[in-house]
Regions:
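Intrinsic-disorder/low-complexity loop/linker signature
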Residues: 11, 60-61, 97
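Short, non-transmembrane alpha-helical segments in secretory-pathway proteins
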Residues: 1-52
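Short, low-complexity, Pro/Ser/Thr/Gly-rich segments in the mature regions of secreted, periplasmic
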Residues: 91-103
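Contiguous hydrophobic segments
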Residues: 21, 74-76, 100
């Protein structure tokens, strides 16, 4: 279930929590097609299995998929979201599904 983020001042942040063995860079395009209502949105997916928070945002024809270390209780406050250490970043082509590791 995707919901709004508490204390988000932009109105564009959404959050979902999961406990799955999913690599978000592989799932990002399907997630985008299913849950994004606007390319202005920024989505956070907290995965309690991996203790990560993934940020998905749109950059033209690419999805920017950034995976961060999970910070305790960050799912409850926009000010804490994405405050963990950046672990990996990927670009996913929205047209082809091609995944490029950025860092």
């Amino acid at each position: 279930m995707v919901s709004n983020v508490r204390n988000d001042v932009t109105g564009n942040w959404r959050i979902a929590t999961i406990a799955e063995n999913i690599e978000m860079q592989d799932y990002a395009l399907d997630y985008y097609k299913g849950y994004f209502k606007s390319d202005d949105e920024i989505h956070a997916i907290v995965n309690f299995n991996y203790k990560t928070t993934t940020k998905i945002s749109v950059m033209g024809n690419l999805l920017d998929v950034s995976v961060y270390e999970y910070v305790d209780k960050e799912e409850h406050d926009a000010k804490l979201l994405f405050s963990g250490k950046l672990l990996k970043e990927y670009h996913v082509n929205k047209d082809t599904g091609e995944i490029e590791e950025i860092q």
